[in-house]
Amino acid sequence: MKKENYSFKQACAVVGGQSAMARLLGVSPPSVNQWIKGVRQLPAERCPAIERATRGEVLCEELRPDIDWSYLRRSACCSQNMSVKQLNDSNKSSFDHT
């Protein structure tokens, strides 16, 4: 039995419809329709772009509740903090000419 993805359907409405969502994601309109109807599962890697496109009105957690987004969000936060720290450290060493 196919399960309609109501959250993705709502996301499409927020951005102006299925065709608009297809353009935003760089996919075909039939793909968007299949993801809504549950013919094919919405790929998890599309969820962050959808969340951004809806300006947070539809969250990744709503689009794919089977994925532990809180873990991924924490990991991404830690990675960004590490990158900023590495950047700061490299900047300090490039200016430290004593």
Swiss-Prot record:
Disulfide bonds: none annotated. GO terms for molecular function: DNA binding. Keywords: Transcription, Transcription regulation. Encoded in the Rac prophage region. When overexpressed, it induces Rac prophage excision, possibly to counteract the lethal toxicity of YdaT. Overexpression of ydaS or ydaST reduces growth and leads to loss of cell viability. May contribute to toxicity and morphological defects. Disruption phenotype: The toxic effects of racR silencing can be observed in the ydaS deletion mutant (where YdaT levels are elevated), but the ydaS-ydaT double deletion mutant shows complete attenuation of the toxic effects of racR silencing. This is Putative transcriptional regulator YdaS. It comes from the Bacteria. Induction: Not expressed under normal physiological conditions. Expression is repressed by the transcriptional repressor RacR. Signal peptide: none annotated. It comes from Escherichia coli (strain K12).
